[in-house]
Amino acid sequence: MFDALLRYMRPVATAFVALLALLIPDNRTSHEPDAALSAILSRDFIQVFTRNTPTTYYEGRHGPTGFEYDLVRRFAESLDVSLSLNSVGNIGDVLSAVRDGRADLGAATLSLDPAEPGILYSRPIMSMQPMVIYHRGIPAPTTPEDLLGLDIAALRGSGTGRALRDLQKSLPELTWQETDELEVTDLIEMVEKGEFDAAVVYAHQFKLNRLFFPDVENGFMLGAPQSLVWAFPKDSGVALLQAANRLIDRLHASGQLDELIARYFGHDDYLEYVGARLFIRHAQARLPRYEAAFKEAARDTGFDWKLLAALGYQESHWKPRATSPTGVRGLMMLTNDTAAEVGVTNRLDPEQSIEGGATYLLHVKGRLQEEITEPDRTWMALAAYNVGLGHLYDAQKITEMQGGDPYKWADVRKALPLLQKRKWYSQVRHGYARGGEPVIYVRNIRRYYEILNYVDRSRRQFHHLGERDDTFPQTPFNTVPPVL
């Protein structure tokens, strides 16, 4: 199902050029055409209204992050002004702020809706595909008719709700519950807990969150793809809109927009549900015993403690007495030589092992070429932790031989498996290696790291997982009745 997702998310500007032209009237208003842009340049900041969600904007380890945050930050930089963000509760609040002029721009997973009054829309930024998701305990819905009789949830004001309304025209008996006071992750969690049979969300939103909810499965794509756009006040001129469109066009043409989409939404699904479920269970049962040690090692080495914890899980499933047939031992699975190098005297002591593993990873990272920047530097250090620096250098050489960038993990990871083929390992210094293993190794660590980040962020910002009631007793869902 997700193999086609990036295809759906490719820019779809061509199909909407004519429509967008219709959305921009010839007789603008009595305002100057550049009124909004002039005001922004004069005050030296742009006011953007958004929502605090994993797919739009949130506070990450190093400050604000998120797909739409990255885009509006670039837009502010292109105007040479500061960025002022105002996070509000729902899409309706964003559009109201745009409509009445409190916002210069709205960026909040908005879909193009020509019927929305008082709004001008940018060119399409990416395509968003509505998708039915469902609880694994029910028969899998595979057609729209299978939705009849199910308890379905959707977000009011979103394009996913419009997809259901479009479907209701051909299935008038269809009904569902909708709200504008929750986020997508709330809906997914409610399906996970069996409070709803199904929900309609965007495919990229589910893909970003699916491993955190192992009892939720993707059903089928519902309706046509929709366009993610920015919203601008209709009565403030079009110069700001045109400036945004120029930025979007540049990002499309340069490939930078595709890179951003892949960065935020293009992860491979390399952990199965069973693996995700097991990891979450181990994170609850085992990790608390070692969390303080990971945090201490993080303070000493500068790594995020959750990255070190993810590395430890990949190595031993957080088992302090783990031993491999090759003689590596302990929670971080250190060899005798590595342990001696980093001052570990007892590999089975979890605190020593964690500190030693973090120190060794820092040493490896420090021996990489200075041209390698983050986050590639961390991913390559992890690969070298697994396969050895010599083999990583060999993979970089093969990458260069193939015309790739030896300082980019996306290129080097393609070359690593070639170390298993005589044609390639015979041309490099360190010879044969099981080069596919470090690729899977880094993939798994990144996904474990994502899950730990999600849980940590949930504690502080979103859901407070495990600390709240099992239901949402005060949630104001409204029933959308059948049209019989």
Curated annotation (Swiss-Prot):
InterPro entries recorded: Lysozyme-like_dom_sf, MltF, Solute-binding_3/MltF_N, Transglyc_AS, Transglycosylase_SLT_dom_1
One Gene Ontology MF term: peptidoglycan lytic transglycosylase activity
UniProt main location, coarse: membrane
CDD domains: MLTF-like, PBP2_YfhD_N
UniProt membrane topology term: Peripheral membrane protein
Enzyme class: lyase
Name the record gives this protein: Membrane-bound lytic murein transglycosylase F
